[in-house]
Amino acid sequence: MPSPGVLTRAAVLSVAALAATITHATEKGMPTTAAGVQDFGAGFMPPTTPFGTVGMRISDYQARVIKDSHGKDNGNDFNINVLAIGLAYLRMTDQQLLGARYGFGAVSVFFRMDADLGIDAGGQRVFSDSAELFRPADVQLIPLILDWRPAPGVGINTQLSIQAPTGDYDKDRLVSPGTNHWTVSPILNASYISPSGLELSSSFQLDINARNAATDYRSGVEYRHEFAVGQHVGDWTLGLGGYYYRQLGDDDAPGLTRGNRARVLALGPAVSFFQPTSGLPAIWLHAYKEFEARNRAEGYTVALRIGASF
């Protein structure tokens, strides 16, 4: 059976992972909610504590190419950099619902965004735009978390996340931290840690989007599978993580003749460090490269997370 320290490390991750939120709406070629949030310990929630658990996530995403529906560079002069700083609060209780512990949480994020786009036709620049800003993104409310521990080394939880259109938004700006629409996301997370310390973790999420009233654009339903495989070695967990993102439904907007369905795969190294008796927060770090993008940007992301229960 995994040691209590291993399970505690996995549990604290869950709130650190919450400290992330949206990038752009799919109408701008990016997913509605953040990708690459979960890796090790996705299925474990923190213990019940007097004051709850807090987490922080800092991520940097960079892309210099937009892929078309065939996976080819669309030829535009494009560059985007998004630095996200997210704070999360999670409170698990001893109340039981459907045989699980009940909990709730919330996430608030700020984005520093720097984007440039140039379009050439006939050897001449016909369009150019840029934006640089540091503004709040949409708030995520998590009114329902259910946490099960069905067997030693096994953690399963389900969550309902509601993303409210509270972030800064301007339909005439190249990029915006906010999406200007509501999103409801059912989530299922699971982890298994073997007696030898081998970990398998997965997170499955659907994003169901409302219509953007400013543009009359409704993004299709989005699916995300985030995963990690790693080995626990003392205070470290070393392995591989990533995510698979795919838009399941067509976008809907006036004059839109194609569904604009996006997809992408990301892979890269992931590592975590935690000493249960040290009093230090748990730390997770991963670096992912995106592949096989369709109808969206393709780039790189690095994310650092910390979490602690009080």
PLM-predicted stretches and their roles:
Residues 29-30, 67, 214-310:
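Outer membrane beta-barrel transmembrane domains
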